[in-house]
Amino acid sequence: MKKLSILVIALCMACGSASAQQALFGGQMPLSPEIHADKTVTFRCMAPNAQKVQITGDFLPTRKMDTPMGQFDAPGVAELTKDEKGVWSYTTTSPLSPELYSYTMMVDGASVTDHLNVYTVRDINNVSNIFLVDGGKADLYKVNKVPHGTVSKVWYEDAKAGITRRMTVYTPAGYETSKEKYPVLYLLHGIGGDEEAWMDLGRASQILDNLIAQGKAKPMIVVMTNGNISQEAAPGYTSEGFIVPTLGLPKTMEGSFEVSFPEVVKFIDARYRTLANSQNRAIAGLSMGGFHSLYISINNPKTFGYVGLFSAAIGKEQKSGGANEYIYDNLDKKLADLFAAKPKLFWIGIGNSDFLYKDNTAFREKLTQKGYPFTYMETDGGHIWRNWRIYLSEYVQKIFK
């Protein structure tokens, strides 16, 4: 009885607190973001004592930003205005196209998330809010009323790395109740990412669920590894505890991950009901993951029947002299070996303002000169998730057919 009384008091206090907050705004908390019928969007921020509030996000016109890695298209910035209640707001000047968007706010120069929007994603060490304007391709990124696959976090012993590591595995709807064997796509993230990236930022499970339900993609297993060979798992899920996510981890792009990858394939073939041959095995990745996909496939020319490079890093400018850097030697000969094995698809996608565009153009020219067949897709924009979701959506409709 005493416990019940305490619970009732606690609930009353919580309700009173919520009511007090709502009373400040006429009984209703501000909504942010608010997607209007015409697909303009209003963002709001409760900061009555702030002097300046801004918003930055990929729904705004881009601005050029120079970085050590090249020139990037950075999200634009817009100013919010304050009303008499201390609520700041900004409404887009035109309707937004269907897409999954991300944004953050800046209150007196400090970057913050939108406290009125609980939906966030992490990209390296940046946390952003997200919202979706539905319709068109964005409907692939939604959870729709279709059969859903299962997403598992799977630990495995990485003998090459000498540690236990984690991967994310998607199995299609019906996997658990059937005896059928399935093809496998190995889907790799970019630098600074991890085994969470394609699920959280790339909407991989939603894309697969929807395209499989529409009959546009074959049911498949999707394996999303952690491409940082020195890392057990994504930050917060390792024995190191709540570490700060960072770029430039040890052994990044020096061959160790590529050398270890055949063990991942063996593990998946042993643990899951797979069609264990090259015609039912695909690999693809974005940026560093495209780099990994290229060098894993050319060093194992009979392993993958489908190769996808999404805004891929192509060449390695500097070598550290490590024992595994032979992986990057003899590119021309290894490409010849790969195409001699007759892959069913070699797919390349990149944005026309991507800082890796020139490298990809030179690589495509090499393939053309050698007479190697490939499929190419060019989109607007730069080195961004908006493009990589498109590439994944296109690629999975072409493999295993």
Give the label of every model feature segment.
Residues 21-42:
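N-terminal edge beta-strand
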Residues 35-401:
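Non-catalytic cap/lid and distal C-terminal segments of serine-dependent acyl enzymes
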Residues 1-23:
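Bacterial Sec-dependent N-terminal signal peptides
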Residues 1, 22-24, 29, 174-175, ...:
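Hydrophobic alpha-helical segments, principally membrane-spanning helices and signal/leader peptides
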